[in-house]
Amino acid sequence: MTAQTQIDHVIIVVQDLERATSDYSLLLGRRPSWQGSHPDHGTANTLFKLDNIYIELLAAAGQGMAADIVTEMLENRGECLGGLVFATPNVEAFVAHARASGLAVSDPMAGSGIDKISGATRRWHNVFWDPTAARGLFSFCIQHDPASELPEAAITQGGAIYGVDHVVVKTSSASAAKRFYGDQLGIRLALEQHVPEWGGTQLFFRASSMSIEVIASETAHEQDELWGIALKSEDIESTHQRLIDAGVNTSDIRAGRKPGTRVCTVKSHTCGVPTLIITDRS
């Protein structure tokens, strides 16, 4: 089946946007691509466009639907990896496919954001579905206006992060994950394997040069959890040393689970998001 969606960005909900922006500028070794607001929805954001997707830091900044979602997440989970957003080049075709696959989606809704530095405006159309369709995980689909290209987050330091390798979703139902990500969103299931030491199944859905790693276990919560993120570095030694020198709490570099990879864990400056840095030398 032709893929209906790619991965557009991940959302990290934060309490203090200025602090979070400083932390992620340091972590990524990049300057923000965009620092804006959504006046109609009561939120403000900072965006970092990487090679494959972008990272959005999102905070409540007024009254509105999005502000309510952010506030509820902060009350229930604290700062966290709060949302996974998919992209389509044809929003009408996506709506038709989703509805035919049993995903009850909204009609496309126009949206816009304003950059506080340049005054530029970006425009898009969003398609929403009830969070129960994703077993509690906040997600939606977006088609960006062709004239609203997001600039790349400029590299400011050596050992900068260049992309997202994967995000981790915890679930109690592998079959529900295959239906949602595979059948309804049209994302390719690249690998499914049983992992006895975890007591469950591991699924890898591939899009946008990254994976959604779904860990399905009977011990998982009833609702799915968007849990952690792995960031790509071309030179993990350089990235690791840069972070250590800046006072970021970072583990030693070690061999990754995938042959040929080396990883380290970042333990601070992540807004509570479990974060791994990975270099693939295979």
Per-region residue spans from a language model:
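Short, low-complexity cationic-aromatic patches
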Residues: 2-3, 16, 47-49, 73-79, ...
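Core segments of cupin and vicinal oxygen chelate
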Residues: 12-61, 100-102, 106-122, 161-162, ...
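N-terminal beta-strand motif that seeds the catalytic metal site of vicinal oxygen chelate
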Residues: 1-17, 79-86, 140-176, 226-229
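Vicinal oxygen chelate
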Residues: 56, 92-160, 203-208, 212-213, ...
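A short, acidic/glycine-rich surface segment
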Residues: 33-34, 65-69, 149-153, 214
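Active-site-adjacent scaffolding segments
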Residues: 51-86, 91-110
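Intrinsically disordered, low-complexity segments enriched in Gly and acidic/Ser/Thr residues
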Residues: 199-245
